[in-house]
Amino acid sequence: ATLSAADAKRVAVNFDRDDNVADGLTHGLYLRLRDLLPDRELVSAGDVVGRVRGIKSPTEHERIARAAETTASLLDGLAAAWTPSMTEADAVEWLHERMREAGYGSAWSWDYCPTVHAGGDADLGHTLPGDRTVPPGELLHVDFGVVRDGYAADIQRLWVRGEVDSGLRAAFEDVRAAIDAGHAALGPGAVGHEVDAAARAEL
């Protein structure tokens, strides 16, 4: 009744084509609103929801930091435990075991978190672990994150087995320059795609 009496011709509701976090309205409820408010234009409240969710309380900042610190600590532990005979599946199980012990959730699907790639011939993207080990001079890549206190982290790490050749060193320097450029573009009001573009411009 309150909304029907309002003068607003446009009503923002929680649907969004691009942001699933702001897309909470079911299609059925959307249709019901259309029936109840035939003279109103229903528009996405995605921008408003995004801005509100982007504001974090001190407690939320602490929980986000704790999730990131926990993830980084587990990755450090994996690096210390790693041996040349460790397979991708072994590395996944090492992290999963500690997550189960501590009661942490995975930042994305358990079967794919962590994602571990051993060597240059490994499949790319979020893949299931195999029996590959890291050949000398090649990389171990781990993409991993835990959920702790309701907040998720997402961290990637690369380690090299043995000596670092000039090609890997050059790639490392390029990526570091891109990260530095993205970091320099961060600040209040910064838009994600602009930060991303600043980083990619270095590659």
Region spans (language model):
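Active-site neighborhoods and metal-handling regions in enzymes and metal-associated proteins
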Residues: 1-203
